[in-house]
């Protein structure tokens, strides 16, 4: 399906899967670059993290920081909808897919 922007009153109503993936990858790279010396030296860090509302905003940022900054195992909870033949998925759906793919690659 070709993704065409749907804008109503300056608000974009749909999401582009590749754009969401790129956004998540950028956040992951930013987090990896900013790991402090304390974390690298083995300072106290969370081992398991539950994030409610993990698909966008602070929740996604928290999950990325816990997983890619501290190496914690994460569980994310969110309510998102997948795309279909006639409708696009929610941005959080695509963000969660991108996070899961990146975490799997890193062995998290």
Which residue stretches match the model-derived regions?
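Non-catalytic terminal and boundary segments that flank Rossmann-like NAD(P)-dependent oxidoreductase
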Residues: 1-51, 81-82, 101-107
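Canonical Rossmann dinucleotide-binding motif of NAD(H)/NADP(H)-dependent dehydrogenases/reductases
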Residues: 35, 40-79
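Glycine-rich phosphate-binding loop and adjoining beta1-alpha1-beta2 segment
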Residues: 71-108
